[in-house]
Amino acid sequence: MDYTQFLDSNSINWDYTKIMDICKISYILDRFSIKENDKILDVGTGTGMLIPFVHQHNPKGNIKGVDKSINMIEIAKEKFKNVQNIVFQLADVESDDIKGTFDKIILFSVFPLLKHKISTTKKLIENNLSDDGKLLIAHPESTKSLNSYIGTNAPIYTPILLDIYQQRNMFRQAGLYVEEAFENDRIYYIILHK
């Protein structure tokens, strides 16, 4: 079973098995400086669990969620069908072109699952990020905690998350601009820009 099949088969109960830490999410999104009317892309949106938090920061801005799981996208569409400025698209961010330019791009709890982390991040920045936009990679846990979870749940989760300084340096070596990189025992985030 690959990860997309895993997501599709678990989508119906996904929201009930995942706990969102409001304090961590709010802290990370505050650091990201979402502005009123920002156009936002939520990569790996799943069932749209992050959308209410993003929408709270930016109730008038357009939000687009993309995910490669058709079942996850269908659930997200149903959950937000009455909210006019939120749309969803079935897409694999690594292989599909995402239409549009965005002020903010968010990869929340999805980055370790990318097979081509650097090239995908670079593609999103070059093709989809506005000139003064920012891209956020974030996790509501530390590298150690996440990698421990991944290790106990292989083979569904096989990638690992690099130490924040290693990842920052890899981005810099690839010519990407890292504005901020932070990790403690509770959160992990990197903010990049053009």
Model-derived features: positions:
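Short alpha-helix
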Residues: 159-174
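Conserved beta-strand signature within the Rossmann-like core of class I S-adenosyl-L-methionine
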Residues: 132-139
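Short, glycine-/aromatic-enriched active-site segment of Class I SAM-dependent methyltransferases
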Residues: 141-157
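A short glycine-rich, Lys/Arg-flanked "PGG" loop and its adjoining helix->strand segment in the class I
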Residues: 119-131
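Class I SAM-dependent methyltransferase SAM/SAH-binding core
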Residues: 47-94
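Conserved class I S-adenosyl-L-methionine
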Residues: 1-33, 143
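A short acidic, Gly/Pro-enriched loop at the edge of an enzyme's catalytic core
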Residues: 97-105
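A short SAM/SAH-binding and catalytic strip from SAM-dependent methyltransferases
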Residues: 104-117
